[in-house]
Each structure stands twice: as structure tokens, then as C-alpha cells.
Amino acid sequence: FHRHFCLATKHRTDGLTFANLAFPLVLPKTPDKTVGFEERGRPKMDGSGGYKGKAEGSNSSEGLWIANLTGEPLDKASEIVWFESAYDAMAEYQINPVKMVYVSTGGTPTEGQMRGLLSVTPNARHYLGFDKDDAGRQFVANFRKVAAEMGFRHEHVQAYHPLGCYKDWNDALLNK
């Protein structure tokens, strides 16, 4: 995944500097043009969660982090795996290292994100690795509705969760 993220640094006027992992957001129809960044900071000193968000000015309604590991153009993809975060996508790959197209919505999936990628990948199977909670189940239902409206067969859109009691793929990797 080394080609699919960078470090972003923010220098504030009060002299503080923050560095985050930044995952470029693109539009599926123009995957070479960055339209924002999904950002993740370091955990705090007390071990609690770090910063999670999007860079100012990001196109969050349509932009997706797309890590196409297949070597083929996006419109030729046969399998696409969706996640709520790039961390979950990379965690799933650590558990199941298969070269597919990995996608993060950077939070709650939007209809614009769904329609954008579905329109470019009409022959692909979509595996929905959203969190195993009420919100994640709703995201799967929303995705299936949009995909059906666009003519996708039900069996081409599948929920894809880690085995066991894990909430998400990162928790599965870390055995939390």
C-alpha cells in the first residue's frame, strides 16, 4: 500500500505542527486526480484514539480512497472490497493478502461514493467490509439498494465481515 498514502503536515499559527497519515481521495472516473484526503493521526499518549477526519476542502461526498492492487484499470476490476477506513482495508489485506481493489469511504458511505464507483465497475463483485455494528448493517442495506437501482445483481453485492466477535477488520488484525 506504500503508493496509496503519504504524510501530511499542518503548521498552525500558534507554532504547533501535526503530522497525519493521509490517504488520497479520488473520483472513480478520474483516479489520477486527488480531491481530498482521509487523515489518521497517532494515538494519544494515554493510549486513546488519535485524530480521524478529512482534510479541509476534501470532496467527501464523492471522493474515495482507492488502492487498486490488481495492475489493471479500475473499469476492468473483478473484485472490489469496501471499508469505512483505509486502516480497515489494510488490516484485511494483512489477514487475507489477495490483490484486489481496496476502497475506503473515510466514514459513512455516501450515495455519491457508491454510484461513482458502481458506474465505473459494472462487471465487478462488491464485497462490503463495513463495521459489524448497526451502522455497518445499514450501510450494507443502503449500498444494496443503490446497486439494485443501477441494475446490479444481488449476488454481486455481498457483506464481508471478519469471523468471530470482531467489530471491524482492524480489531480482527489486532485481536481486540
Task: Label each residue range with its predicted role.
Residues 5, 35, 62-64, 167, ...:
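Flexible, active-site-adjacent loop/turn segments at secondary-structure boundaries
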Residues 94-176:
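TOPRIM fold recognition
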Residues 4-8, 36, 136:
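Glycine-centered structural positions embedded in regular secondary structure
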Residues 1-16:
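Short, basic/aromatic recognition patches
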Residues 12-122:
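Phosphate-handling DNA/RNA-contact segment within nucleic-acid enzymes
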